[in-house]
Amino acid sequence: MKLVLDTNVYCDYAEGAPDVVEAMAHYGEFLFIPSVALGELNYAFMKGRRQQFNERKLRQVINRLKMDIIDVNADVARKYGMIFLSLERKGTKIPINDLWIAACCMEVGGTLLTRDKHFTQVDQIDVMIL
C-alpha cells in the first residue's frame, strides 16, 4: 500500500508512537511525504530550540524509510482545485495546507495516514485515521 504521511503522523513517528510505527510497518510498502508537510515541519523546527537536530532527524528518517517526497506541480495544483471546489460545494472547509496535502495524496493514489478526521471529508482520497 502507498502511505502518504500527514505532518502530525511524522511527528508522532519521530517520537516513537507505537500506533504510527505499527501502521507504517504493516501497511507502508511505499512511503511518501508531501513537500507541504515538509514546509510545516521546517516552520516548527525553526520556531523550536532544536532546529538542527530535528532537521537532521527528518533527513535521516526520509532516507532510512526510503520515503518519496511529493512535490507540488501543475498536476497537483489541478487536484487541489478539484478538491477545494468539491468541499466548497458541500459547505465544508479544511485548512489550506491540508487541501494541498490531500492533493499530493491524490497525485500518487495513496492512502493518507493522519490523526486529522477532517480529511474524511475529502472524497477523492483514501484516509486512515489513527
Predicted regions and their residues:
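Active-site neighborhoods of divalent-metal-dependent phosphate/nucleic-acid chemistry enzymes
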Residues: 68-113
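A generic structural signal for short hydrophobic patches within well-formed alpha-helices
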Residues: 10, 38-41, 77, 119
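Acidic active-site catalytic centers that drive phospho-/nucleotidyl reactions
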Residues: 6-8, 40, 98, 116
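Short, hinge-like loop/turn segments at secondary-structure boundaries
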Residues: 47-52, 87-88, 129-130
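Conserved beta-strand segments of alpha/beta enzyme cores
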Residues: 30, 68, 126-128
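Short, well-structured N-terminal submotif of metal-dependent ribonuclease cores
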Residues: 1-34, 45-60
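Acidic, PIN/NYN-like endoribonuclease modules and their adjacent C-terminal/linker elements
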Residues: 1, 102, 106-130
